[in-house]
């Protein structure tokens, strides 16, 4: 006790007011014996212990003592000293702890409230024993027992006993923290009332311990504290006063902020803080982050204060689902987050405005001048081609340095598993862009990767952690420096974690307004580059912080394709101003440059993985088809060495990046060339990752006889067509090499192949190549077939699944080659006989077994999808037994109980029914129809949607078969089955839009297919009426536009059946009324177009019904022509010309069918709107519709012929006596032809036509 100031000790003795013997001194004076801080898992949610967060190597039995004198009573639980790794405790330990807890708890319960000296002495003793017990999470102590003990302890301690209140607060904090107990609501109410009263009544020196107890009580209990929130967070609430910037004690202020942060933690399924209290806490946290460090606060306390405020905001955004709807709130938060991101970063101190505003241009972020730091800034700059060795003394196990390598802050899971030795012995460095001065590469600091320097044209400068023996500081000062750096890094990590939560809580379109504040841009000549996330990635000495920054950047880039699509720099910019598209393109280029610099400079495998993932996100979203070449080439050449990295996560992410390259805007000519390059690494100097400098470095696949005979590979002796395909094949099927097996955590013990993630990623890259660059993949068709067979033979379902997906992509690529509009020349296609050979090998292999793998329904479904990707021409070339096998398997799987399998089977049957070799097989079509009708009754919407699509395909087959010369199919197809199909389609037309769109399509085809023999049967009459009513209601109702388009198309199909009583049936007027309503007023022009096309289908005047009906149709079409440009949606304007074309075609079609009684109504409309109609018909004759409109007449001769046919028909009509309408209409048409032929130089042709 000699170390204690005598005056203060005497003051404390006077405060206690009695004399005590030495053995009981520690129970009355504030000498507290505390157990060590909790482990990482136990400390969760208690950041006040973060400066003393122990590593797993700390002994659970170590005890630290802290003597509280005067204000020292506010000091936190002291950090325990590191010691040897503890041995595993015996299994009886938890029972022993439980017994000790029960024994002490029983003694405490036996005590009665008493103000005597002996009673206080006994309570002190019991509290000390309870605090010093060696608890561990899950130690057999029931939570309700802990809560009951704490309630009893508080009942025994009156609030006028400051020392006992301090001790019971320590007990609450210790037990709840160590045993991870969440207090139940009833006991929580009592304990909160007690602690709130204690803060109000006890001496200020006790507030620190009381606030720690309060933080432990409210942790994950915010929803149960509603009645106490006014006392805590009200205008004069305790936490608001104690956390105010004007509060005199910085430690108490920090503890109060920690309590607020814990209050903001939410528990899923429970109510959260009211919005008003959320806003109060948010504003308090924001004020703390905006306020500078006060003079009476030390740096570490300030760092912990910032951490707690950041954690509080993160909790509000994550669990509370707080929405930053006000621009001021979001801008203020982003401003403080950007400042906190760089807190304590060596050599950098930025000044930020109070609020950031959305703007496409970089905003001011001035830098305060900083003094050169020693010894970092005084380090010598080694040259680029010479390594300099640094002596690195093993550091003492300082508490602050340990904390740097602890769990990541918040949600950011960066650099997991980084060992302490790696962190303490590394020499940190990074390349930085030229505006920062110098650029550095990492120097070998004993990392496992053993990275050497890479030659670079940039000047090199290294940042490093200098051991205390090399610095001007003493060992103690060096330890404090390391501790300070650790806490500053934690603030930066906390800010990045909070920023990540902010990104997830706001819309991307809002976030991209702040793009320039966080994403780098190419600096103007002579101006410094603004600080950004890449500044942290390149300059932060902490690998964990670098990884956090990369994770935030990845979140920003994810889903940014639409935003980045405006970028363009394909031409040199020479304008007086910089367009936004050029600015975004410049930002994309700078991101590529900085990320590639970071890739070269990084020595931590975990951070390296984050860099590559971030690059993959950038590559997936950047519009390379609008950017100058070489960006992808640089990414490609930089990433190739990392494919052979020792760390499996780096290798997997490297393949992911290559997959992103080959899938972005495929096919790109630049990537096509890269795929054909030799397989060198693209580097001239050595690096930390082993790479291949020659093609011999790649694994070689032995070519079997079957491959030599069947493969389309280039002849022997020529260059490898695609090294990436060769790499992926070898990764999937060949045993791994020793050079890559050292750190393959996650690979199966004794496995001879690459780890599963690596093989799965290789299969995905092959699938991307097959989808985007099939011309290269087809060279390996048979070889890839062997890879697929090998994958499907493996026990790992994931490998099997990805093998089957690759098969589907290959099949789809083969189908695309043979489509009529394919750009692949016939001689460059894979021959049909080879495609048949490929599929025969698949069907002779494990594919049937995958189809029958009932224990893996996802695999079964994918196998069905693969089976549906057989080229139709190749299917007919398969042996009969293989064709029967495919059909039998699919029809059998349609009875599956699993909805995934059933949906895939229904779709596959819908594909097969279109095959030319199967569509005329009445038995197959009937079996398929029955299977589809059964699936239409399934409970799963997905199954019904696939079945409806297949039903539409099947009815398309019926229509195709109508055009064949042989009528046997129509005669043999069952009328009863046709009736069932109509009934099912009617029922499906009332289903969800996904089902309805194909159901109405099927209805139209079925009504078109009906033969006179069907229509004459009484049982069909009613079903025909119901079917047409279903179509009419779908046309008129406000359904999805695709559904209405299909319904109009179906009505047109119905009108094509001459056997139906169109014109005389009662439903005729309803059908025409629905179509004319749509053609005049539907918001979607594509639906209007389809309606106009349907109105021009009937081929006889009688099918249009009465004179009144014909007049209504004619008037509706004229009105549609008038309104063809009336739209508020600018996206519809591109369909205006097509709409006018179809309406003009319909009007001319009606003129070609009009009877004498129809002519007066036509003349009437021509009198009023003749000029408008004439101008649009002339425009139609001149240009027609665009070439992309399949329903329009494209030939000028055909368009002229339509007018001439109409004119000839009107001439032939026998006009009624005294009727002038015929002459007027003839004159109108002749005038149109005259004007058109004058403009096109066809006057002679016109005269011959008129003479006829």
Curated annotation (Swiss-Prot):
This chain's source organism reads Rattus norvegicus (Rat)
- Repeat in keyword set: yes
UniProt lists compositionally biased (Basic residues) regions at 384-396
Origin, by domain of life?
A: Eukaryota
Protein name as catalogued: HEAT repeat-containing protein 6
Alphabetized UniProt keyword annotations? Phosphoprotein, Repeat
Which residues carry the post-translational modification Phosphoserine, per the record? 471, 474, 714
One Pfam annotation, family name?
A: DUF4042
Give residue ranges of the HEAT repeats: 230-269, 524-562, 586-624, 630-667
What InterPro entries does the entry give? Answer: ARM-like, ARM-type_fold, DUF4042, HEAT6
Give disulfide pairs as residue numbers: none
Indicate where the modification Phosphothreonine is found in the sequence. 689
Residue span of region Disordered: 365-417
DNA repair found in the keyword field: no
């Amino acid at each position: 006790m000699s170390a204690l100031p005598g005056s203060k000790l005497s003051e404390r003795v006077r405060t206690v007011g009695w004399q005590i013997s030495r053995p009981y001194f520690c129970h009355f004076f504030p000498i507290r014996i505390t157990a060590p801080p909790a482990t990482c898992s136990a400390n969760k949610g208690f950041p006040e212990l973060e400066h003393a967060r122990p590593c797993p190597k700390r002994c659970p039995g170590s005890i630290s003592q802290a003597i509280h004198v005067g204000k020292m009573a506010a000091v936190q639980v002291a950090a325990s000293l590191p010691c040897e790794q503890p041995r595993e405790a015996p299994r009886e330990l938890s029972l022993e702890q439980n017994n000790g807890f029960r024994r002490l708890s029983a003694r405490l319960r036996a005590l009665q409230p008493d103000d005597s000296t002996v009673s206080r002495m006994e309570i002190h003793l019991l509290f000390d024993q309870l605090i010093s017990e060696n608890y561990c999470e899950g130690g057999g102590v029931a939570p309700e027992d802990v809560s009951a003990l704490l309630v009893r302890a508080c009942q025994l301690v009156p609030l006028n006993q400051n020392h006992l209140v301090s001790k019971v607060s320590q007990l609450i904090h210790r037990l709840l923290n160590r045993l991870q107990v969440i207090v139940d609501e009833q006991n929580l109410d009592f304990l909160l009332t007690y602690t709130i009263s204690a803060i109000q009544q006890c001496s200020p020196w006790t507030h620190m311990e009381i606030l720690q107890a309060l933080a432990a009580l409210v942790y994950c209990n915010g929803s149960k504290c509603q009645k106490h929130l006014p006392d805590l967070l009200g205008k004069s609430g305790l936490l608001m006063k104690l956390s105010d910037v004007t509060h005199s004690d910085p430690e108490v202020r920090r503890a109060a902020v920690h309590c607020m942060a814990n209050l903001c933690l939410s528990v899923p399924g429970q109510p959260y803080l009211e919005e008003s209290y959320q806003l109060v806490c948010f504003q308090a946290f924001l004020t703390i982050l905006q306020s500078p460090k006060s003079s009476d606060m030390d740096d570490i306390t300030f760092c912990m204060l910032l951490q707690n405020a950041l954690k509080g905001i993160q909790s509000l955004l994550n669990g509370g689902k707080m929405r930053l709807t006000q621009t001021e709130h979001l801008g203020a938060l982003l401003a403080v987050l950007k400042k906190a991101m760089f807190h304590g970063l060596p050599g950098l101190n930025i000044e930020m405005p109070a609020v950031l505003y959305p703007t496409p241009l970089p905003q001011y972020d001035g830098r305060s001048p900083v003094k050169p730091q020693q010894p970092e800034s005084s380090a010598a700059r080694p040259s680029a081609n010479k390594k300099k060795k640094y002596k690195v003394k093993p550091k003492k196990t300082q508490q602050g340095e340990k904390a740097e390598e602890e769990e990541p802050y918040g949600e950011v899971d960066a650099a997991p598993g980084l060992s302490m030795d790696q962190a303490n012995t590394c020499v940190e460095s990074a390349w930085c862009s030229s505006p920062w001065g110098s650029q550095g590469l990492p120097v070998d600091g004993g990392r496992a990767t053993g990275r050497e320097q890479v030659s670079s044209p940039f000047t090199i400068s290294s940042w490093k952690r200098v051991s205390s023996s090399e610095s001007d500081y003493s060992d103690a000062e060096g330890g404090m420096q390391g501790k300070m750096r650790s806490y500053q890094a934690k603030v930066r990590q906390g800010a990045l974690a909070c920023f990540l939560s902010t990104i997830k809580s706001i819309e991307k379109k809002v976030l991209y307004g702040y793009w320039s504040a966080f994403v780098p841009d190419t600096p103007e000549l002579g101006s410094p580059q603004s600080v950004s996330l890449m500044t942290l990635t390149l300059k932060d000495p902490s690998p964990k912080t670098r990884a956090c920054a990369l994770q935030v950047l990845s979140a920003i880039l994810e889903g940014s394709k639409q935003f980045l699509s405006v970028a363009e720099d394909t031409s040199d910019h020479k304008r007086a101003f910089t367009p936004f598209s050029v600015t975004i393109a410049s930002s994309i280029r700078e991101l590529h440059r900085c990320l590639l610099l970071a890739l070269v400079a990084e020595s931590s495998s975990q951070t390296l993985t984050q860099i590559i993932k971030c690059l993959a996100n950038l590559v997936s979203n950047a519009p390379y088809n609008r950017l100058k070449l070489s960006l992808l080439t640089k990414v490609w050449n930089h990433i190739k060495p990392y494919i052979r990295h020792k760390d499996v996560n780096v290798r997997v992410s490297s393949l992911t990046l290559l997959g992103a390259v080959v899938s972005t805007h495929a096919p790109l000519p630049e990537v096509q060339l890269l795929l054909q390059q030799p397989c060198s690494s693209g580097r001239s100097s050595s690096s930390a990752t082993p790479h291949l400098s020659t093609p011999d470095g790649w694994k070689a696949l032995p070519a079997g006889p079957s491959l030599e005979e069947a493969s389309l590979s280039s002849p022997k002796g020529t260059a490898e067509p695609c090294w990436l395909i060769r790499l992926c094949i070898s990764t999937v099927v060949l045993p791994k090499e020793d050079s890559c097996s050292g750190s393959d955590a996650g690979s199966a013990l004794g496995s001879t192949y690459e780890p599963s993630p690596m093989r799965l990623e290789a299969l995905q890259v092959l699938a991307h190549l097959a989808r985007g660059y099939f011309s290269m993949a087809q060279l390996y068709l048979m070889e890839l077939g062997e890879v697929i067979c090998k994958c499907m033979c493996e026990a790992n379902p994931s490998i099997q699944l990805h093998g089957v997906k690759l098969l589907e992509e290959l099949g789809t690529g083969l189908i695309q080659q043979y489509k009529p509009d394919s750009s692949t020349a016939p001689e460059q296609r894979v021959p049909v006989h080879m495609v048949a050979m490929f599929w025969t090998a698949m069907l002779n292999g494990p594919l049937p077994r995958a189809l029958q793998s009932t224990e893996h329904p996802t695999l079964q479904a994918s196998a069905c999808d693969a089976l549906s990707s057989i080229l139709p021409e190749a299917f007919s070339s398969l042996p009969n037994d293989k064709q029967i096998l495919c059909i039998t398997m699919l029809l059998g799987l349609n009875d599956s109980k699993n909805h995934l399998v059933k949906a895939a089977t229904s779709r596959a049957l819908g594909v097969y029914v279109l095959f030319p070799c199967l569509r005329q097989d009445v038995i197959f079509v009937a079996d398929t129809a029955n299977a589809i009708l059964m699936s239409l009754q399934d409970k799963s919407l997905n199954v019904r949607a696939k079945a409806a699509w297949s039903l539409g395909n099947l009815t398309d087959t019926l229509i195709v078969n109508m055009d064949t010369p042989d009528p046997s199919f129509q005669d043999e197809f069952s009328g009863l089955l046709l009736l069932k199909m109509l009934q099912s389609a009617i029922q499906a037309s009332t289903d969800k839009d996904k089902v309805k769109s194909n159901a109405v399509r099927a209805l139209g085809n079925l009504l078109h297919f009906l033969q006179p023999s069907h229509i004459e049967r009484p049982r069909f009459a009613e079903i025909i009426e119901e079917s047409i009513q279903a179509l009419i209601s779908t046309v008129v109702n406000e359904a999805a536009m695709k559904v209405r388009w299909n319904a109009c198309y179906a009505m047109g199909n119905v009108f094509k059946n001459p056997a139906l009583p169109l014109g005389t049936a009662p439903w005729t007027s309803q059908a025409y009324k629905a179509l004319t309503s749509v053609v005049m007023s539907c918001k979607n022009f594509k639906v209007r177009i389809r309606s106009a096309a349907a109105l021009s289908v009937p081929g006889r005047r009688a099918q249009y019904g009465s004179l009144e009906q014909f007049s209504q149709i004619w008037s509706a079409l004229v009105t549609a022509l008038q309104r063809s440009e009336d739209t508020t949606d600018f996206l519809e304007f591109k369909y205006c010309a097509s709409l006018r074309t179809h309406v003009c075609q319909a009007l001319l079609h009606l003129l070609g069918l009009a009877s004498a009684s129809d002519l007066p109504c036509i003349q009437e409309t021509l009198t009023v709107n003749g000029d408008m109609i004439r101008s649009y018909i002339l425009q139609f004759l001149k240009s027609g519709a665009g070439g992309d409109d399949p329903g329009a007449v494209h030939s000028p001769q055909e368009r002229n012929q339509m007018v001439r046919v109409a004119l000839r028909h009107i001439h032939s009509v026998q006009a009624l006596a005294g009727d002038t309408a015929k002459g007027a209409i003839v004159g109108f048409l002749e005038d149109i032809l005259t004007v058109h032929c004058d403009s096109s130089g066809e006057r002679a042709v016109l005269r011959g036509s008129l003479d006829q």
